[in-house]
């Protein structure tokens, strides 16, 4: 069963601003996520520690001399939502993950709030 993988609305313009090599590599691991869903593991995906969402994970890939991470989570519809990406090479890993997780948490919380609001409208 193929899994649905979506870009968060705020992530889409950020994705389009990335170098084409990074876009291609990200789409390749997103395809793996669509094929394997939550079963996708290392070296392509791993759990993010420190998130307020227990199901927050990261896609992992290398492109353009960088070590890229994309925070994502599966929502209640069982769809993977790609939230934010960043190159973790050349800097404080702790600071990188703190910033990545903060942005991912904010975006995923907003996504969940929108889903709840839509459900109430029905």
Spans of features found by a protein language model:
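Basic, Lys/Arg-enriched alpha-helical interface segments
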Residues: 1-67, 76-80, 87-122
């Amino acid at each position: 069963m193929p899994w649905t993988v979506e870009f968060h609305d705020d992530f889409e313009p950020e994705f389009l601003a990335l170098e084409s090599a990074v876009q291609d590599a990200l789409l390749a691991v997103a395809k793996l996520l669509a094929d394997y869903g939550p079963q996708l593991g290392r070296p392509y995906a791993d759990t993010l520690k420190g998130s307020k969402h227990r199901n927050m994970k990261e896609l992992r890939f290398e492109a353009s001399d960088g070590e890229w991470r994309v925070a994502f989570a599966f929502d209640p519809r069982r769809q993977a939502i790609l939230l934010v990406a960043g190159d973790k090479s050349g800097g404080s890993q702790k600071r990188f993950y703190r910033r990545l997780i903060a942005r991912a948490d904010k975006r995923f919380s907003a996504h969940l709030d929108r889903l709840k609001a839509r459900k109430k409208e029905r």
